[in-house]
Amino acid sequence: MPNHGRLTQKGSGGASEADRSQVLLDLRGVEKAYRTPAGDFLALKGIDLQVQRGAFVAITGKSGAGKSTLINMVTGIDRPTAGEVHVGNVAVHHLREDQVAVWRGGNVGVIFQFFQLLPMLTCAQNVMLPMDFASLYKSTRERRERALYLLEQVDIAEQANKLPSAVSGGQRQRVAIARALANDPMFLAADEPTGNLDSKTADAIFAVFAKLVSQGKTILMVTHDRDLASRTDRCLRIVDGQLVPARINKPLAQEIV
């Protein structure tokens, strides 16, 4: 596996030889029910999923099929009604609310369709914010240095001192990716990250993801874009809350230029 330090400036540590150690995301019999006036609605129906470290996995499906609910399970944003969610050696489904917030802040990078940048902060300050919340890096200077480093990695460093409103949608999404990487997360969860972008800009964002995967990051991406999904390592489809068997795509290395 490539050295994560090329991206994060932090050591990746040694890896066990056991195959099991290569599984980063492990969902076992995950169900999620929501109460409605008409009764319980089962959004996820017994999801079993394993994602290897360093994989780029796409989740596709129609609106309402359960894609975002699945993302919420692996990120700890929501809890399963039944089943188990393991990330690395952490049983996320067993964490208390205060524990899961701390765990997510240090281990998960979430990327949204509509960027979710704070408009009153500069691009660099938006990237620094997760470090501040997680009390990582000792000084404002260190946090800014890391923010600039990450913005450079996603080719947006020249916009560091601008407000989000002063840059394009594609540039804002690059800032959002840098922010998601701020605390060197174990994996990135991207929920429709190109859904608000034109096709050319979406391709550019996908190239950023491909670069991150080449440097050892694990990415789980929800998308309606079948072309982008077909270019990941592995493509899954959710139909009525159930996963359709995986398809192995062409090597992601072909995307990296």
Regions found by a protein language model. Give the residues of each.
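ABC-family P-loop ATPase nucleotide-binding domain
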Residues: 1-33, 245-257
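ABC family nucleotide-binding domain
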Residues: 23-238
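H-loop (His-switch) and adjacent beta-strand-loop-beta switch element
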Residues: 235-248
